[in-house]
């Protein structure tokens, strides 16, 4: 799967199994300006399920839903 597919898959998962709101939020930045690392979390109904890091907000925003889906599939939440 491409990274973009994880966002779509998570959206479909939430629509099918949850009735709540899916939210992505940047929760941290670290590193120097030329090598910044962004950390993003994914929450469903206000409950945080996964985190993702990346050199850009977009990269972190692609890694976070992947980690969330892995957690949800592992725990069958």
Question: Over which residues does each language-model region extend?
Answer:
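Double-stranded RNA-binding/processing signature
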Residues: 1-77
């Amino acid at each position: 799967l491409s990274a973009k597919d994880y966002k779509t898959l998570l959206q479909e998962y939430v629509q099918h199994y949850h009735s709540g709101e899916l939210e992505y939020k940047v929760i941290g930045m670290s590193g120097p300006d030329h090598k910044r690392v962004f950390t993003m979390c994914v929450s469903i109904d206000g409950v945080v399920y996964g985190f993702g890091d990346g050199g850009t907000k977009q990269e972190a925003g692609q890694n976070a839903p992947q980690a969330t889906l892995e957690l949800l599939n592992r725990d069958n939440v």
